[in-house]
């Protein structure tokens, strides 16, 4: 396990998709996270960066796709996603800069 000093190094980017956007109404946010981070580090990072109370963290490792190029085959990088659920009494995270509905 590697030690990551800054919590902003754990959260790489929010996942922008139709499915993740629909989960925001339920209080679940999806982030691309550092591949070496664990659930505890992700929870602490979200609480420090956004100032909310996290109730659960689910993670998923996604294999990179094999893509054809002019010179043969290449591979996209593997990614790790975290689905973070915040408590109902926490304020919503404004990832996209505005209200959801």
Swiss-Prot record:
Pfam families the UniProt entry points to: Ribosomal_L23 (PF00276)
Domain of life: Bacteria
Entry keyword set: Ribonucleoprotein, Ribosomal protein, RNA-binding, rRNA-binding
GO BP: translation
Entry GO CC: ribonucleoprotein complex; ribosome
A single MF term (Gene Ontology): structural constituent of ribosome
Coiled-coil zones: none
Subunit-structure text: Part of the 50S ribosomal subunit. Contacts protein L29, and trigger factor when it is bound to the ribosome.
Classification via NCBIfam families: PRK05738.2-4, PRK05738.2-5
Family: Belongs to the universal ribosomal protein uL23 family.
Its biological purpose: One of the early assembly proteins it binds 23S rRNA. One of the proteins that surrounds the polypeptide exit tunnel on the outside of the ribosome. Forms the main docking site for trigger factor binding to the ribosome.
PANTHER family per record: 60S RIBOSOMAL PROTEIN L23A (PTHR11620)
HAMAP family linked: Ribosomal_uL23_B
Name of this chain's protein: Large ribosomal subunit protein uL23
Organism annotation: Nocardia farcinica (strain IFM 10152)
């Amino acid at each position: 396990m590697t030690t990551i000093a800054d919590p902003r190094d754990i959260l790489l980017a929010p996942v922008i998709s139709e499915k993740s956007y629909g989960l925001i109404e339920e209080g679940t946010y999806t982030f691309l996270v550092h591949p070496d981070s664990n659930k505890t580090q992700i929870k602490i990072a979200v609480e420090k960066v956004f100032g909310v109370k996290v109730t659960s963290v689910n993670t998923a490792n996604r294999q990179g796709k094999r893509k054809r190029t002019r010179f043969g085959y290449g591979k996209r990088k593997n990614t790790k996603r975290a689905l973070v659920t915040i408590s109902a009494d926490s304020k919503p995270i404004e990832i996209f800069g505005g209200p959801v509905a």
